[in-house]
Amino acid sequence: MEGRHDNSPTQAFDKDVLELTVEDVYDISYVIGRDLLKVNTGGNREISDLQFKIVRVLEMFETMVNKYNLSLEELRMEMDNMRTETDRVVAEGSSGNINTVGPNKLVVDLKDPNRPRFTMQELKEVLQERNKLKAQLLVAQEELQLYKSGVLSSQQNMVEVNLETVPQSEPLRSSITEESKEKSTIQKLFSFRPK
């Protein structure tokens, strides 16, 4: 504050616009007000109107300088935060806490709820398996509809076919074992799958 008393209010006019503070705006308004009082000794109406316009401009100027200083302070705080974060990352890197990552590698934050959980290959395999299961479900549903409509007999035995061997002309009923008679309904429905 002592340096402030040593400086005259007119020095605020010599500063760069971006260096002005709110106190400088007050100094400028003081100088302009003092000069207007010297001129307005005669009570001239035009000078009085000009005085109100100047006060309004100074108020706008004060608001603008205040906003600029707040923005500047926010930027300084952000810069300090970034500098602190950079120092922390550098310190972690030098202490060996960070694994080195080569090209074509992705660093994933395990706490991020939107992180990728599967590789593309795993997703392709899951989708292919899903499509196969969908196809099997559709076949099973069609077969179930045939059973319900009576087209297929519910007592009709299903035969498993091995696609790698040459099929016999007609399977013998005596070759059906007791084990195949006890198959569950789901096993019967999916018995068309190749071995």
Swiss-Prot record:
Coiled-coil segments on the chain, per record: 58-149
Residue ranges annotated for the RH2 domain, each copy included: 115-185
One Gene Ontology term of the molecular function aspect: small GTPase binding
CDD domains: RILP-like
InterPro entries membership: DZIP_RILPL (IPR051241), RH1 (IPR034743), RH2 (IPR034744), RILP_dimer (IPR021563)
Function: Involved in cell shape and neuronal morphogenesis, positively regulating the establishment and maintenance of dendritic spines. Plays a role in cellular protein transport.
The protein, known as: RILP-like protein 2
Species the sequence originates in: Danio rerio (Zebrafish)
